[in-house]
Amino acid sequence: MRIHILGICGTFMGGLAMLARQLGHEVTGSDANVYPPMSTLLEKQGIELIQGYDASQLEPQPDLVIIGNAMTRGNPCVEAVLEKNIPYMSGPQWLHDFVLRDRWVLAVAGTHGKTTTAGMATWILEQCGYKPGFVIGGVPGNFEVSAHLGESDFFVIEADEYDCAFFDKRSKFVHYCPRTLILNNLEFDHADIFDDLKAIQKQFHHLVRIVPGQGRIIWPENDINLKQTMAMGCWSEQELVGEQGHWQAKKLTTDASEWEVLLDGEKVGEVKWSLVGEHNMHNGLMAIAAARHVGVAPADAANALGSFINARRRLELRGEANGVTVYDDFAHHPTAILATLAALRGKVGGTARIIAVLEPRSNTMKMGICKDDLAPSLGRADEVFLLQPAHIPWQVAEVAEACVQPAHWSGDVDTLADMVVKTAQPGDHILVMSNGGFGGIHQKLLDGLAKKAEAAQ
């Protein structure tokens, strides 16, 4: 079959393209911005990429067009597909029909930690000989790709609540039909497509509804929003994580780089890994519980996590200059900012200085939905620098004023980088947080710090 993918350079759609190639289909695709690393990955798989959406790319006519969720009516290719009656479907629908239908699906859903937890579950199964397939929203550190067909019945998927396509406004995850479901947490997010928390809970309950009776749902017992969702009705086995639940994690070190796994009060495993932070410990516990449902002993799962490498942009060390370390993180919601800063604080100790540099870039952030929670979430940083994005209906100066520590802002990335370099001293740790490229600020900081070191000699 010849498949053409509109919006191929996103992580999810690029992953589907790789799976389609592994299934033996001829695959082409287009995107408004064809750029590495995804373009390189796809071209290596023999997938032809086209820049832009000129309708001529649909000649000769493909057998099927997979339409990404960023595509809208008015797009020349979308209009041509509809006009010529070319068969089309959304990415999640294709995944269900061509990949997941006969598989044991382990899905990871929730507001935070999906990519990390899905990566952990995949690595546990891989290390324990299960050879799973996977589709993950970032490239897990232990693998070279974000999607793989696998060689067994088991398939791990990052289950996103975002919508499928302009013609299917349900959450992607309703197509995945999981047998093992991790619900990490639930908060209001994606304010561009959801009106309120109830609207998201409704979609999550659609997901809960399609887990089989002998399937299993693993969720944290202290999450009020999930508790309300589960109270709408659940027909599957449940395992709870947390103090009153079946599973607990007990820190053995302050930074959570070593921890015990407890099941029904008994120690069943111990994790020693390169990750830090209680949020990662929570993610790891979820992955261990999910792996047990498919047959992996918790002790084996815990051992496997010892060699787990996280996806890029998860408290990733980007470099060091003038004695200052620069980290990068994908955090783009107050809860994630709080967890990432807590993890870094645990890693570097209570007296080291942490400088937080934040770009409010997600749609929810830009709309100002969670702006009042930003200053408290930044509390563990010693100094804060904020970028003021253009064309948003609120001012980051409000957040700077609400911060208890010194806080500064600028509307220009270069100016902001200069301000950070000026204040940073040897021994400091800079944490850059954004779900985008942040104007290449990481390298600007490292270059600026190196120049500062030269000037001081």
Curated annotation (Swiss-Prot):
Catalytic reactions on record: UDP-N-acetyl-alpha-D-muramate + L-alanyl-gamma-D-glutamyl-meso-2,6-diaminopimelate + ATP = UDP-N-acetyl-alpha-D-muramoyl-L-alanyl-gamma-D-glutamyl-meso-2,6-diaminopimelate + ADP + phosphate + H(+)
This protein's GO CC annotations: cytoplasm; extracellular region
Keyword Methyltransferase on entry: no
Cofactor(s) needed for function: Mg(2+)
Biological process, per Gene Ontology: cell division; cell wall organization; peptidoglycan biosynthetic process; peptidoglycan turnover; regulation of cell shape
Loss of function: phenotype: Enzyme ligase activity totally absent. No effect on growth.
EC category: ligase
Localization annotation: Secreted
pH dependence: Optimum pH is 8.4.
InterPro entries reported in the protein's UniProt record: Mpl, Mur-like_cat_sf, Mur_ligase_C, Mur_ligase_C_dom_sf, Mur_ligase_cen, Mur_ligase_N, MurCDEF_pg_biosynth
Binding annotation for ATP: 110-116
Pathway this chain belongs to: Cell wall biogenesis; peptidoglycan recycling
EC number: 6.3.2.45
A Pfam family per the record: Mur_ligase_C
SUPFAM superfamilies: MurCD N-terminal domain, MurD-like peptide ligases, catalytic domain, MurD-like peptide ligases, peptide-binding domain
Key word Cell division present: yes
Gene3D superfamilies: Mur ligase, C-terminal domain, Mur-like, catalytic domain, NAD(P)-binding Rossmann-like Domain
Positions of transmembrane segments: none
Primary localization: secreted
Residues of the signal peptide: none
Keyword field: ATP-binding, Cell cycle, Cell division, Cell shape, Cell wall biogenesis/degradation, Ligase, Magnesium, Nucleotide-binding, Peptidoglycan synthesis, Secreted
Protein purpose: Reutilizes the intact tripeptide L-alanyl-gamma-D-glutamyl-meso-diaminopimelate by linking it to UDP-N-acetylmuramate. The enzyme can also use the tetrapeptide L-alanyl-gamma-D-glutamyl-meso-2,6-diaminoheptanedioyl-D-alanine or the pentapeptide L-alanyl-gamma-D-glutamyl-meso-2,6-diaminoheptandioyl-D-alanyl-D-alanine in vivo and in vitro.
Family: Belongs to the MurCDEF family. Mpl subfamily.
Record's protein name: UDP-N-acetylmuramate--L-alanyl-gamma-D-glutamyl-meso-2,6-diaminoheptandioate ligase
